[in-house]
Amino acid sequence: MAFGIGASRTAEESKMVIVMRNDLKMSKGKIAAQAAHAAVNCAFAAKKKDPKNLDKWMGEGQKKVVVKVNSEKELFEVKALADAAGLINSVITDAGRTEIAPGTVTCIDRKSVV
């Protein structure tokens, strides 16, 4: 599951936070691909739901950070917090063509302002 661009309305710096599952033991390349899926999904969602904040993030250099959680349960706990805060986010599930089973939730993404 990937967690992407989220926004706190009081902060000044925008950044995208990608929350990646560490328990899946994905290769570095797989992690990079899942993070890219998360970033793209979140940016497209922000374009529709919060274009002004997306423009701000783009203008500030598109800062991104990747953090980890140790289970799918923890990932969905983070998603619940993002939803409660009104942050744009998306869940990324894998197609299962390479390293992990189809439908495995790998990360979440959100757009945030910190």
Report the location of each language-model feature.
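Terminal signal-anchor or tail-anchor transmembrane helices
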Residues: 1-2
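Mid-chain, well-packed structural core segment of small domains
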Residues: 61-101
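Conserved small/polar residues in nucleotide/adenosyl-binding loops
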Residues: 111-114
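Compact, glycine-rich, soluble single-domain proteins
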Residues: 36, 41-64, 68-73, 84
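Glycine- and Gly-Pro-enriched alpha-helical subdomains that act as flexible
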Residues: 6-49
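Short, solvent-exposed beta-strand edge segments and adjacent coil->beta transition regions
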Residues: 15, 62-64, 105-107
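Solvent-exposed alpha-helices and their adjacent loops that cap or buttress functional pockets
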Residues: 8-12, 57-59, 98-102
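Short hydrophobic/aromatic beta-strand micro-patches
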Residues: 19, 66-70, 109
